[in-house]
Amino acid sequence: MRIISGKLKGKKIFFSKSTTTRPLKDSVKESIFNILTHSKLLNISLDNSNILDLYSGFGSFGLECISRGAQKITFVEKNEIIAKILKKNLLTLGIKNGITLVVDDIKKFLSRDLFEKY
């Protein structure tokens, strides 16, 4: 698993095969970003954006967003073991600023008053 585009292009993302969490395949990720960045209907730019990555897993989607210019990412992952691997990915890639890693149930997280706009 790797980062497809942007300033971190080609960098590897750690993941564990021994968990039930499945990483987002590169081909699927590439299709998602092609739709997001090239659709005239959506008109989305990741530059300086604030992204909420729910069910983050190993961070593949959020890390791709950072690589493509997102300014802030909030990762939400329930599984503490998976969250540790995500944190390792952030440290290995040298990503420190604009990152929030929340280890919590998604429904609980979304039921809170969110002060950020995503």
Report each predicted region and the residues it spans.
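S-adenosyl-L-methionine
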Residues: 1-63, 68, 84-117
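Conserved SAM-binding motif I beta-strand of class I
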Residues: 72-77
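Catalytic phosphate/metal-binding cores of nucleic-acid and nucleotide-processing enzymes, i.e., regions
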Residues: 80
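Residue-level signal for alpha-helical context at structural boundaries
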Residues: 50, 83-84
